[in-house]
Amino acid sequence: NLRRDDSHAPVRELRPSKPIAISSSVDVSRLVLSTLRSIGTDDAVPLGSPYPDPSLFPFEKLNRYAYAAGRDKSLWGVTDGLPPGHPRLIRQIARRYLENGMSVDPNEIIVTVGATEAINLCLQAVAKPGDTIAVESPTFYAMLHAIERMGMKAIEVATHPEYGIDIAALAAIAKSQPIAACMVMPNFQNPLGFQMPDERKRELVALATKADLPIIENGVYNELYFGNMHPSTLKSFDRHGIVLHCASFSKSLTAAYRIGWALPGRYREQVEKLKFLNTLATPSLPQLAIAEFLERDGYEHHLRRIRKAYAQQANLMRAMVSRFFPEGTRISSPAGGYVLWIELPVQVDAMRLYQLALEQGITIGPGYMFSIADSYRNFIRLNYSSPWSPEIERAVVTVGKLAASCLD
């Protein structure tokens, strides 16, 4: 059942998801925490990591700028970190959007402790405990964590592996029951990797506007595109403040500093107040270090380097999975980001495969983490951000062999 020698084995593409549209409580945090702890071990090959490999990040420059800022005693208080955030960083964030074709009012930007806080604050601003939130299927578990944390329910919406959330299905769900908000990742969605076409983005924003349905847009991977043009955002098509856009530098510059932001549209006042009540302030030193880097160094040059690396590594990993995984395996075709979503034959249980791989010193992301239901039990997510090496290659081949052993 294992492909070994055919380097031209055909790649089978994923099929659209078909979740059962039932509103359910969310309880995924324990499984995700357990999985992430195993990923954090130093001797494991991190194919299951949700984080980008840090080897391509400019840590020396960032730390030098942070050290220089730390010598300024005027920054030792918290006032510079109070909402909405440090003005220098806010100016650079607004400038970056403008460079990518979207005009942003700097006064709308609220700096947060990573995109996770931005998502949590935006969700809290538009919904209350017990409300139902529409999500993609599969969906990034950080979205599910936010819903779980606030005692809300989630309903999964059918999602196409190339085009994104099924807008007609979302409209039908919103018509049939109260939906407080919709959480989506239109660019390089984790785990599917798709880039939603512009016409579908317009259609989704039009639906949200008509239905008065707030959309929380997770844009953390927007800078990691493989094509020639920076992708548009849902926010760029929003004329009524219905889109709450969240992003961060964690996936493109450094995860260690935990700096994100929100563009909350008409909900800005609520989000700023919640930010103040939640964490009071965002630390000033990492804000200033990143602002200094954006002002002085080649951020775009840095991004071109990691985009090129990720695109090459995505092709290598897709080829290896196609060659060494069991017959019938289906693989995503990411347009950006750094993860592959893989559908294995139905006989393969992802949690069993996860345990077998862990015994071999390899981590993978089991599909259970990306759904509120018992879905994607034969799916896994693999991270291709680490520079390609014999160790990575052996790990991918080993996971393929272990998957084949689960067919017996």
Residues covered by each model-derived region:
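Conserved PLP cofactor-binding pocket of PLP-dependent enzymes
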Residues: V220, L358-R381
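Conserved core of the PLP fold type I
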Residues: A66-A211, I216, N222-H240, Y310, ...
